Amino acid sequence: SLKAQIFGCWSIPLGLPYNENLLVRIKLSLKPDGTVINSEILDHARMNKPGQGFYKVLAESALRAIRLCQPLRVPSTGYERWKDLQLNFDAREMLKG
């Protein structure tokens, strides 16, 4: 899956407080060849709020993973279904394995 490919490139930053709600939602737009046209953090305003430094670090690491994984291996059919995606990067889910 596309999510599994990107998560395989994601290095979760060390030292984050994983008891917090550290869910980063990212909207992706893809070309038919799997290249990312645009990646946008949906809770972008949260990155600049006081006390949200951990969230910002995690969000930046998720965007980095998307860049590193390009081009994604995408299905040869159904472009209309997967050209725009929303991915949820949840550090707690990743740490559970």
Model-predicted segments: where are they?
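Conserved "boundary/linchpin" sites in short secondary-structure elements
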Residues: A4-S11, K27-N48, L63-G97
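Short secondary-structure boundary micro-motifs
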Residues: W10-P13, Y55-K56
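Short loop/turn motifs at secondary-structure junctions and domain boundaries
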Residues: L16-N21
